[in-house]
Amino acid sequence: MVRITMEDGGIIDIELNEEVAPITCENFKKLVKEGFYNGLTFHRVIPGFMIQGGCPLGTGTGGPGWNIKGEFAANGVNNPLKHTRGVISMARSMNPNSAGSQFFIMHKDAPHLDGQYAAFGKVVAGMDVVDKIAAVRTDWNDKIGRASCRERV
């Protein structure tokens, strides 16, 4: 279980699915343990679709300095997780093996992403916080608030 604590005290608890996406989960847990995500923002918010975070630059262009294999069907990995409301998945470029630290949480269902991105867990508490973030008025430069991400005991 991983907990994201927002600057305003809002909490999002995420259960990771290590059986389906072991590489992705291991990478995510490593970044959490190192404190990589602490103080970062949800830099991309698209209401009715998803909220995205995990970029150290806050622009959508940064990462941890390495990439991992994309664990999804179009990349030869059996990953039956669907991109439904509350699912967490890895963001990437057009390169299927370009995921590093950026992730997104589904605000609404997006079946067109199934098999194309590495879903690796689901929000088990705190969808009200995701809804609140998704409701914030945004433009290309808005930052949503700092978050601290840590493993929950």
Language model: regions and residue ranges:
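Cyclophilin-like peptidyl-prolyl cis-trans isomerases
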Residues: 1-150
